[in-house]
Regions:
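Acidic/polar, glycine-enriched structural segments that form the non-catalytic walls/loops
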Residues: 1-145
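Aromatic-rich carbohydrate-recognition surfaces in CAZymes
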Residues: 50-52, 58, 145-219
Length: 219
């Protein structure tokens, strides 16, 4: 039978759904785990039985989908990914091929060139799109993927150098607009979480750094 696992945060309408494109043979809740969870925490496991003829192979795809709004939205995303993941993967490959062509370099040191290409890819992984704020560059994976005023003053210079002026300008715009909402006095925020909560309204350096960052992006 199918086993679609659903989980919801007790205090918020945050939902996650996960499963696979094959029937599960065994599933169990509250299984032992090596991961230390905060609060009450929940765990689940599923077992899949696969029979392979000699010299054959089989692909098993797992899907994780979530929503900050409802279980229905999470389930819709889950079904969409399950049905179209092959096409989505090809689209993603094409996207990253185009990304590597942006700000492309060709140097004798191919190892350094590979590092440069991975820097562009890693930077793209930090791009976030918040409905309530806009698109911006996060600070760093995995601990601090949200918005920082100080960090971006430095990061955006590298972003422009690798050819992504659009994301650099979008990030500056989000910092400016969210700082205005939080401070209303020209002070630039230090940190904003993904729920648009400004947890730190800014130190002395963020405002000066922001002015310099604007100059470096638009000069």
């Amino acid at each position: 039978q199918d086993a679609i696992f659903k989980a919801k945060d007790l205090g918020n309408n945050w939902n996650v759904i996960w499963g696979a494109d094959q029937h599960t043979s065994i599933y169990q809740l509250d299984t032992p785990t090596y991961i230390n969870t905060q609060g009450t925490g929940k765990s689940a496991s599923s077992t899949y039985t696969i029979t392979l003829p000699k010299n054959q192979e089989k692909k098993l795809s797992f899907v994780i989908a979530g929503s900050k709004d409802s279980e229905e939205d999470a389930l819709k995303s889950y079904k969409d990914i399950l049905a179209n993941h092959s096409e989505m993967l090809e689209d993603k490959k094409m996207y990253y091929t185009q990304l590597l062509e942006r700000g492309r370099i060709n140097i004798p040191d191919k190892k350094l060139q590979e590092v440069y290409n991975w820097c562009k890819i890693n930077t793209e992984w930090l791009a976030a799109d918040m409905e309530s704020a806009g698109r911006f560059l996060g600070a760093g994976a995995i601990e601090y993927p949200w918005l920082f005023g100080c960090d971006n003053s430095y990061s955006l210079q590298g972003l422009v150098a690798t050819g992504d002026q659009k994301l650099a300008k979008e990030t500056l715009r989000v910092i400016k607009e969210m700082s205005e909402k939080a401070n209303r006095n020209g002070r630039i925020l230090h940190e904003m979480a993904f729920n648009a909560f400004v947890s730190h309204k800014g130190n002395t350096q963020e405002t000066a750094h922001f002015v310099i960052a604007v100059w470096n992006v638009y000069k």
